[in-house]
Amino acid sequence: MSATSEYPVQRWFGMEVLDHSQGAIDWSRMRSGAPLLAQHDRWSTKGQIGVVEEAWLDDDRRMRVRVRFSKSKEAEEIWRDVVDGIRRNVSCGYLPQEMVLEKREGDLEHFRVTRWQPFEISIVSVAADPTVGIGRSTDQTTSTITIRGSEMDEQENTTTTAQQPGKSVNGEHQEPTTRTFAEPKDGALEKERQRSADILALGERFSQRDLAMQAVTQGYSVDSFRRQLLDAQAPQPIDTNPGDNQRDLPQFNHQRPGQNVEKLGITERDMSQYSLLRAINAMATGDYKDAGFEREVSNAIADASGTEARGLFMPHEALFGGMLRQQEKKTPSKGGILVDTDMRTDMYTEILKNRTVLGALGATVLSGLQGDVDIPKQLSEGNFYWLDEDGEAPQSDIDFGTIGLSPKTISGAIAITRRLRKQASMSIENLVRNELLSGVAVTTDKGYLYGTGEDNQPLGLMYQTGIPGLTYADKFGWDEAVDMETQVGQANVSANGMGYLTSVGQRGAGKKTFVAAGTGERLWHNNEVNGYRAMASNQVNADTWVFGDWAQVLIALWGVVDLKVDQATKAASDGLILRVFQDVDVNARRKEAFSIARKSVA
């Protein structure tokens, strides 16, 4: 199919023509497996629908390509539309490297890109070049559109240099020029460039590139985009049992390269054959004859991430591989407590969320992250005014800050006996998996509540400064609960995520404590305190109560589970220790969303 031509395209700086003479095109990226995309979607894992197999310059001064479509569901749907003649339009993403000014027509300037590098081909719905597309021959000149550059970041789109000496336009020798774009006298172009650059920088910082591009094209101001960005990334309280198609934060789906193995070409059916015990035995013996698949998965993850495993990388999906068989559930005598249902690639996130006390209270889990992450938070409220009919609203300055999340490694050890290693039972596999999940969950809870902030631990909520609180003399009662709720309510915190957390001992005391004398109503009733959900954990100190908006808590997960076998510790019994590593961090967006009550020291 034809992908580009010398058809003039209206751009934000003027008219642009891509030169198609010999030597004008840098083929390095296009001829090394450039992607075939849907609608220039370069960030979603489902955006790539194929690959460019061949690219060449034809005699009619057009770039033509031969592409191969993927067998994924999304690609198959687009391929059927192509075959049926519904999708005909093609676009090319490219980087301009050299550009010259050819002529001016009033305020309109015409540029020729004399050196450029194409790097992707897209099947699009709407574009701008009516001479290229699927199935177009040299004498066809209607119906196709190619959008060049409008889908690209501005830093890609404005990189230009002077024409090389000796280049000619329309047969006439041209002297080198360094002028590329005419600046309007009022500086409007410079302001527009700054607006676009600021929005794109914010989108890049908070992993919201698509939202930023939309804001640029729709003319949003930087302040408007900040508010839009804050709304897009604000965590919401999540139900304890999410539906099949729910996610904790949809906008983080494109950040799952470390967790989702589909991008590596591994299907859910493949993962159902993954055996944790086979992987453990292979690491112990060094013989991967029976664990070739498990080793291939680890190698694929290592290649994709550019890191080496301590032993083997295990994707989160593998924690549920093999659990696809339907057994009687919720029946301990029949293995029901060890059985899960259909595997989903987000199960690790959801089950870890439910295993942690923080998650059960409504904390937000962000998974599949890469590198340090900054989450925006609003530091001050906007100002609103009553206006006359023709009045203008004064400028409102809104302060924004960020919450930093960085990988902190949780390491655990699971003892596996010689006899346990020889078992092939699915229940034994699930037993080891459950032990792994529970260990990560308990450590995450402990880290957020009582982390010291040292030795690669997060700084726990109990040790942070600036958190509202109170003390009680003898027994936590109704008055203390009301005071805590009032402290949190004064911070304008959403009531949807509010709840109590205390120790198991205090839960028992709450069940014996009357709200008021003679009422018969208990402080702790049906796992609620004053209408708010309440939970107890042995992680909490004996005389401590915490109340707050738990949706403000962020649990961040990076990469995959890293496994390493330790044979030395239990060598005498021919057992081993499975050492587990998972990168996690926890933090809260607003400390004032919590109140802590402690028993006063006599």
Curated annotation (Swiss-Prot):
According to the UniProt entry, which residue ranges have a biased composition of type Basic and acidic residues? 170-191
Where does the record place it?
A: Virion
Instruction: Indicate the principal place this protein occupies in or around the cell.
Output: virion
The source's domain of life comes to: Viruses
Output compositional bias ranges, type Polar residues. 157-167
Q: What does this protein do?
A: Assembles to form an icosahedral capsid.
Q: What is this protein called?
A: Major capsid protein
- Specify the species: Halomonas phage phiHAP-1 (isolate -/Gulf of Mexico/-/2001)
